[in-house]
Amino acid sequence: MSTLDAAFGALADPTRRAMIQRLRSGEATISALATPHEMTLSGAFKHVRVLQDAGLVRSEKRGRTVWCWLDPKPLRKVADWVSHYEAFWNSQLDSLSAHLSNSRGKEG
């Protein structure tokens, strides 16, 4: 599986997207990532593992606590892919808008 495929797969889950959102503000413990979702630590760790496998999150055990933080490189690949298609669709919508404007002008 490519890095991009793994990233999209990991981001397909709303809980993992919320964890990514939380990690935007800085590193967090597994416990802090689990709390808003009322899930067990093992459940949160499974989500973090998917994010790690996709390269989106890194972690480190400090004492008895596991800390997590974002790795921006795979997110940049996702953003680049999305922006490519955003430009394409914006162009298509602009063409459609011009076509509709011309069609209305011919009817009147």
Feature annotation, model-predicted:
Residues 1-3, 22-41, 50-58, 73-108:
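C-terminal regulatory/oligomerization modules of transcriptional regulators
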Residues 4-11:
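Short amphipathic alpha-helical boundary/capping segments
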Residues 12, 58-60:
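Well-ordered beta-strand positions
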Residues 61-67:
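Short, Lys/Arg-rich nucleic-acid/phosphate-binding segment
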Residues 70:
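Conserved catalytic core of two-component histidine kinases
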